[in-house]
Curated annotation (Swiss-Prot):
A Pfam entry, by short name: ATP-synt_ab_N
Family recorded in the similarity comment: Belongs to the ATPase alpha/beta chains family.
CDD domains cross-referenced by the UniProt entry: ATP-synt_F1_alpha_C, ATP-synt_F1_alpha_N, F1-ATPase_alpha_CD
Native source organism of the sequence: Illicium oligandrum
Annotated compartments: Plastid, Chloroplast thylakoid membrane
MF annotations from Gene Ontology: ADP binding; ATP binding; proton-transporting ATP synthase activity, rotational mechanism
Keyword presence, Chloroplast: yes
Keywords, alphabetical: ATP synthesis, ATP-binding, CF(1), Chloroplast, Hydrogen ion transport, Ion transport, Membrane, Nucleotide-binding, Plastid, Thylakoid, Translocase, Transport
Reaction(s) the record says it catalyses: ATP + H2O + 4 H(+)(in) = ADP + phosphate + 5 H(+)(out)
Name by which UniProt lists this protein: ATP synthase subunit alpha, chloroplastic
Gene: atpA
Binding sites annotated in the UniProt record for ATP: G170, D171, R172, Q173, T174, G175, K176, T177
Amino acid sequence: MVTIRADEISNIIRERIEQYNREVKIVNTGTVLQVGDGIARIHGLDEVMAGELVEFEEGTIGIAPNSESNNVGVVLMGDGLMIQEGSSVKATGRIAQIPVSEAYLGRVINALAKPIDGRGEISASESRLIESPAPGIISRRSVYEPLQTGLIAIDSMIPIGRGQRELIIGDRQTGKTAVATDTILNQKGQNVICVYVAIGQKASSVAQVVTTFQERGAMEYTIVVAETADSPATLQYLAPYTGAALAEYFMYRERHTLIIYDDPSKQAQAYRQMSLLLRRPPGREAYPGDVFYLHSRLLERAAKSSSRLGEGSMTALPIVETQSGDVSAYIPTNVISITDGQIFLSADLFNAGIRPAINVGISVSRVGSAAQIKAMKQVAGKSKLELAQFAELEAFAQFASDLDKATQNQLARGQRLRELLKQSQSAPFTVEEQIVTIYTGANGYLDLLEIGQVKKFLVQLRTHLRTNKPQFQEIICSTRTFTEQAEALLKEAIQEQIELFLLQEQA
């Protein structure tokens, strides 16, 4: 027979009384009414904040952008296949945020900052809100430092400065992503952190970009944020904000960053899908009324910080695809009005073999020569005007049978100027090489050569200068000015190379 020991029972009761915690935990919960198409309708969650994260019973996380009188609309960050009608949901009390640290450099992550490159977890001690406010007027200063892309056509005529927002716009397959990736490759050794955000792209295209970065040693200073075409609309919508949060982390640490959004029109489509499923009223092209705010709050985060904040910068290059060159569509006009200029890529130029296919006539940088070193301003000042005049003259010359000598000379000069702007992909030029190239063309030294010889001659000239006149590069690097001494050295090198080149061609 079991004996009951009263002292043991009383000890257990005393222990339990001592351990008793009267703390009351309040949890804001709700019940799933309906789920499907990446959207859930929740009854309850009375005190949920706009944009608050909510957690479902089986672990899926969602964001609550819609609060209606009798339910809350939640967009799911996942497929939500295990969520059932009637299951419980609890509010987390947190707004969407991601971990941030230096360890993200060289990694490929998704919109939730989780690694997707199979190289293990990323350690981070800090976190940032995915949507944080843009710097105010006092926190900024005007753009004055150049961000070199390595592309002659851009750096000489449509210069981009650190802290600027420059749109890259054009039809599909015109080399928009190539311009952006070349700009990242050119940041090697420039102490610039790069973030490439792929929104709704094919997984194979993203893999190709990552492979290029790895082969060229660019991944060591680059973070790739990828949400491919098969990702849920919520994650495609969040990806650019995740990229911006990572770039801001470095900007506020007095570093220079470059962020590429490829492309915001896919983000707008994902946002349209979410909004229509949440039954928000549609507007133009079925986009919701706040689609302008979607992009403006993203692009306004790019800035050049004031001296008080350490002069860090975040330069944004959004890429927008047009349909048949129509830049007056809804999303292109929105982004054009937000950015500080646009680089327009033309399908006609691309098909004519002019690559990068930049239409210099209608491309513009609203920062202008403030984002160029003095040497580049001195050499490339008139190039854009000359090319625009040439394009006009070329169109006119098609209908004229006999042209005077001056017009023929201007056409010949323009053709050679256009030729020197051609560049192979993933082959960026240094500023010194660009100055050499433009000076040679703008001052008529290429007029002696046939158009087919221009590229070959310029390659040899740049090599000749590098090996035989290293002082030229030293002068440009140290003074950032095209001095008389530099000009004399360059003229001498051009004369030597022209004589040698013509002899080689005759032989």
